[in-house]
UniProtKB/Swiss-Prot annotation:
Organism for this UniProt entry: Debaryomyces hansenii (strain ATCC 36239 / CBS 767 / BCRC 21394 / JCM 1990 / NBRC 0083 / IGC 2968)
Keywords assigned by UniProt, alphabetized: Coiled coil
Assembly and interaction partners: Interacts with RIM101 by binding to its two YPX[LI] motifs.
Pfam families linked: ALIX_LYPXL_bnd (PF13949), BRO1 (PF03097)
Region (Disordered), start-end ranges: 740-766
InterPro entries, A to Z: ALIX_V_dom (IPR025304), BRO1_dom (IPR004328), BRO1_sf (IPR038499)
Protein name, entry field: pH-response regulator protein palA/RIM20
Record-stated family: Belongs to the palA/RIM20 family.
Family annotation (SMART domains): BRO1
GO CC aspect terms: endosome
Coiled coil ranges: 544-581, 633-692
Length: 766
């Protein structure tokens, strides 16, 4: 394009089959068949492929349509799919050749890139309009403001991301605010220049042209400042905007010199022309690599200023003899800004009828359903499983403390294995015996190691950030490096990490207890695992004792009550199985889906956050289906209390009647049987402790990974903040002329006008 303006080249991207990527996500994560969305998947695939085919300097209206459609469809995809579900690769094009690729697993980053492509489109469309017709200049200005609006929208979105405490996305380095600020400022400056050019063609007053010129200079000055702050803006562009800055400053003072001449202010006329010529000289010092059209314009202006200055100086020296003020003594030229970033209307509104994936559940709803399913699992564990295990423990402890059923087994079965011992052996073998425990201990050891690694990862990240901050604080000085120290900024994370370490230290003590608990009963567990043969050899026989009728009746009643204990235990096992089936057959997700469909329009219209709390009423209603089960559990608890009372009374009667007839062989057998009963009770307790330990570490890993992610986000946020502060401090230290952004700003602070120029109206001032 042969022009003295710059356009923003399209970013480049690798082609991916977005439709297929989303299809795989639907298959893995959703409860709907992907075939229901074949048309939508094909449509989004075509849109993404069209994006990868955009060509510089060949823009047409279809480019805008493709970008806008894909941008809006991405908005809906973001609502329906997890943000990190697809990886996209993009290449920067602002430097010398393309840079990258930058790979981002984020739909939001993809949408930012499309907004960038729209800004590029409008910048190129502006340069394709005629610079010699009133209509062409109007359209060009409108396009440039639209381009600035796209880049400004990107800046605002990125600022919101950087302000988030958690869940922030990693912004690619070449889309950092200083680069986007340059692009936005460049577009605004060129839009203002277009109005300036229109004012020339319209023959406007010199006072108007001067104000438009100085404002154009200030906009280019801002662009130069951001260009110097960004590592991705090439020298040609920085020199271009710097030359433009000085060019329009010169043009503004040249127009003011005409006004001074007309107002008989001959000294001020000469001073204004001198400032104009000095600005031209500053522009020429930055002409390297600058477009020939820009330099030709500058040369033409310079020649005009030189010839006018010669005449003005001669007339003043020979005729008027007026004092020539210095630049600082000249009245500032108020700027007249008639442009601003305008987000294209097509971006702000979209036809809902063409939205893709309308019938697909938002992934958030799937997550909410899963969250409530986990809550239901926790409810079942807390309300049924844990209480029943606790009741069973109490019941077993109660029986073993009274030497039951060993005391009556010794009498009734002096040589045979008691049925309870056989059942315990079969149960321990079915669970996996000692192998189950050793495997569980190995698993806990692995989980412990993983937990420690995550903890160390959190500590390492904070240390790295603190070291980086210390280096910059030492380099820049504590007064200049004006941001909170790492110890202050990371205090919340330090507290979390300290608590994590305390939890692990406490858990280590618990692990040691479990190991000692296992070693204590390990020989007896191996005996249980040996089955009938090992047990019959280990348990000593006792001599047969003839019992009187009363003791025999007591033993029979005790046996019945102990059998009732087994019956209650089996009843509870069956009860938990029924609970599991009920929970599995009554998934809460359909209820959440129905509720979402009823209220989704209201939620979206009110822009309300959809989260777990939005469906609390659904969960409360759903969980009432377990009310009858809660009543059963309460009845079972009362039945156990009554049963324990009966056993205790009868056992006391048994002990009082039988203590005189117990011989040594019976005592030894009873002692061994009681030991085996105690081992079984401790085995159940050990299994429970192992499960709790495994659950603790699994939960710890999930929660500590969240902390690790928060630490990553914190470090990233601090690095972005530090880079911006470093650039700010470095810019303060750069010599004035090298930045190319300061000549006009101190002397002529911008005075914003009352409105923004509408191309359909003339130029007006408030």
């Amino acid at each position: 394009m042969n022009t003295n303006l710059l356009y923003i080249p399209y970013r480049e991207t690798d082609i991916i089959d977005l439709g297929n990527e989303l299809r795989n996500i639907i298959k893995m994560e959703y409860f709907q068949p992907s075939s229901n969305f074949d048309r939508d998947l094909q449509a989004v695939r075509n849109l993404r492929n069209n994006i990868s085919n955009l060509k510089n300097e060949q823009v047409n209206n279809n480019d805008e349509t493709v970008c806008v459609q894909y941008y809006h469809q991405l908005s809906n995809v973001i609502k329906k799919f997890p943000d990190e579900c697809v990886e996209f690769s993009w290449y920067g094009t602002l430097g010398y050749g393309r840079s990258g690729p930058t790979r981002s697993r984020s739909l939001r980053i993809e949408q930012l890139n499309i907004l960038y492509q729209l800004g590029s489109y409008f910048s190129q469309a502006a340069l394709m309009e005629s610079r010699y017709s009133d209509e062409g200049l109007k359209k060009s200005c409108s396009y440039l403001q639209a381009a600035a609006g796209c880049f400004n929208s990107m800046i605002l979105q990125i600022q919101k991301e950087n302000e988030k405490e958690t869940g922030m996305i990693r912004i690619p380095r070449d889309l950092q605010p200083e680069t986007l600020q340059f692009l936005k400022s460049l577009m605004i400056a060129q839009a203002q220049e277009t109005i300036w050019q229109k004012s020339l063609a319209s023959g406007m007053k010199d006072s108007v042209i001067a104000r438009l010129s100085i404002q154009t200079s200030e906009y280019y000055s801002t662009a130069a400042k951001y260009g110097n702050s960004s590592e991705f803006i090439k020298l040609e562009w920085i020199n271009h905007v710097t030359v433009k800055q000085f060019h329009f400053k010169a043009a503004a003072h040249y127009r003011v010199s005409i006004l001074n001449h007309e107002g008989f202010k001959y000294g001020e006329q000469v001073a204004s022309l001198q400032v104009a010529l000095s600005s031209c000289d500053s522009a020429f010092r930055k002409k390297k690599y600058v477009n020939d059209f820009v330099i030709e314009d500058l040369q033409g202006l310079t020649e005009t200023i030189k010839s006018t200055l010669r005449v003005a100086e001669k007339d003043n020296d020979l005729v008027y003899l007026k004092p020539v003020p210095k630049e600082n003594d000249l009245a500032p030229i108020p700027g007249a800004s008639l442009v601003k970033p305008i987000l294209p209307p097509a971006i702000e509104s979209f036809d809902d009828s063409s939205v893709l994936f309308k019938e697909l559940l938002p992934y958030l709803i799937v997550q909410v359903g899963q969250a409530y399913r986990e809550r239901q699992d926790s409810f079942i564990r807390d309300s049924f499983i844990d209480p029943i295990q606790s009741l069973n423990k109490i019941m077993y402890k109660f029986i073993t403390e009274r030497n039951l059923p060993a005391s009556i087994d010794t009498i009734q079965k002096p040589e045979n294995l008691p049925e309870s011992i056989i059942q315990h052996s079969q149960e321990i073998i079915s669970y996996g015996g000692t192998k189950l425990i050793e495997d569980s201990l190995n698993e806990i050891a692995k989980l412990t190691l993983e937990s420690r690694h995550i903890l160390e990862g959190c500590q390492e990240r904070l240390k790295i950030e603190a070291d980086e901050d210390d280096i910059m604080r030492e380099r820049q000085g504590s007064q200049r490096w004006a941001r909170p120290k790492s110890s202050e900024a990371s205090s919340e994370f330090i507290n979390k990490i300290n608590k994590m370490e305390q939890y692990l230290d406490q858990a280590k003590e618990g692990d040691q207890f479990i190991i000692s608990q296992y070693h204590e009963i390990e020989p007896y567990l191996q005996l249980y695992c040996g089955g009938y043969k090992e047990l019959i050899q280990f348990i000593p026989n006792s001599t047969y004792v003839k019992l009187d009728t009363k003791i025999n009746e007591i033993i029979i009643k005790l046996r019945e009550l102990i059998n009732e204990v087994s019956r209650i235990e089996n009843q509870r096992k069956q009860f938990l199985t029924r609970i599991e089936i009920k929970a599995r057959n009554n998934n809460i997700l359909p209820s959440i889906i129905d509720s979402f469909k009823k209220k989704q329009r209201k939620l979206y219209e009110e822009n309300a956050a959809i989260d777990e709390r939005s469906f609390e009423d659904v969960y409360a209603k759903h969980i009432t289906m377990f009310n009858s089960d809660l009543r059963f559990l309460e009845d079972s608890k009362h039945a156990q209390i009554a049963l324990e009372g009966n056993i205790d009374d009868l056992n006391q009667e048994f002990e009082s009647e039988y203590q005189h007839t117990n011989n040594e062989s019976q005592y030894k057998r009873q002692e061994v049987l009681q030991t085996l009963e105690n081992v079984y009770t401790k085995y159940l307790e050990l299994i429970s402790n192992l499960n709790e330990g495994s659950k603790f570490y699994s939960d710890f890993i999930i929660k500590s990974n969240s902390v690790l992610k928060e630490c990553d986000e914190y470090v990233y946020h601090r690095r972005v903040e530090g880079r911006e502060l470093e650039m700010f401090l470095n810019n303060q230290a750069v010599p004035v002329e090298s930045v190319g952004s300061q000549q006009s700003a101190p002397d002529f602070p911008p005075q914003p006008m009352g409105g923004t120029w509408n191309p359909n109206n003339g130029i007006k001032f408030g």
